[in-house]
A protein has these predicted regions:
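Hydrophobic anchor residue at the start of the ABC signature
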Residues: 136
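Conserved ABC ATPase "signature" region
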Residues: 103-119
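The feature captures the beta-strand-to-loop junction immediately N-terminal to the Walker
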Residues: 33-35
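Conserved ABC transporter NBD signature motif
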Residues: 56-67, 71-72
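Catalytic Walker B motif of ABC-type/P-loop ATPase nucleotide-binding domains
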Residues: 147-151
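Helix-to-loop junction immediately C-terminal to a conserved catalytic motif
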Residues: 48
Length: 229
């Protein structure tokens, strides 16, 4: 189980995250939605151990992720919105770095994200969509039980969006936990729960409330209002 417990975070005088608490169970996908700049990425960075909260805890299977970086490395795969890759290296070298070993790279990950013909290519020469696929593949090499994805299908065409989402479903079937930030209606519809972030606070839609009509009304309301950065 992934637990987010009373997380608070300020940027300057702005309260970006205000007493955020929720949990994610094995095999569950949770979508976090909100306007650009509302704090979604900040929350994922805290959950991934990249950023420290002012208050609160992140627990992976009961272990406090803030106190032990080994817990984060063992349990969490993180796909940030910004490109985390080593641009000067090849695709294969990036995969090896993220795997933390020079052993043979998992073939199923390479095949799933169609990287076979790109292994010797320098990352700097890849398109934005190819880099995105590689970033997701890197996060998945160790098949972590927790996967945090910030706008995972950004820069992908419809074919690869569908491919990534199919893969997420397979991952969930094997009891993986997924938290995504997204503006994509189909991704929201495919989630078990939807958390709406506004003014530093989360409200939740249950599965039976996640309808296309509710999502569009929700997005329209969010687009009418500003959010924290």
């Amino acid at each position: 189980m992934l637990e987010v417990v009373h997380i608070q975070k300020k940027r300057g005088k702005k309260q970006v995250l205000n007493d955020i608490s929720f949990q994610v169970n094995c095999g569950e996908c949770v979508a976090i939605v909100g306007r650009n700049g509302c704090g979604k990425s900040t929350l994922l960075q805290i959950m991934a151990g990249v950023l420290k909260p002012d208050q609160g805890e992140i627990r992976y299977f009961g272990k406090d992720a803030r106190k032990d970086r080994k817990v984060v490395r063992e349990y969490c795969g993180y796909v940030p919105q910004e490109n985390p890759l080593m641009e000067e290296l090849t695709v294969k070298d990036n995969l090896r770095l993220w795997a933390g070993t020079s052993r043979e790279i998992e073939r199923n990950v390479i095949e799933q994200f169609q990287l076979d013909e790109l292994m010797k290519e320098q990352v700097a020469k890849l398109s934005g969509g190819m880099k995105r696929r590689l970033g997701i593949a890197c996060a998945m090499l160790r098949w972590p039980p927790i996967l945090l994805m910030d706008e995972p299908t950004t820069a992908l065409d419809i074919y690869y969006k569908d491919s990534v989402w199919q893969w997420i479903q397979q991952y969930r079937e094997k009891n993986g936990m997924v938290v995504i930030t997204t503006h994509d209606e189909r991704e929201i519809m495919g989630a078990d729960r939807c958390l709406i972030m506004q003014d530093g606070v989360l409200t939740e839609l249950e599965k039976n409330e996640i309808t296309m009509e509710n999502i569009r009304q929700m997005m329209d309301r969010l687009n009418e209002k500003g959010g924290n950065k």
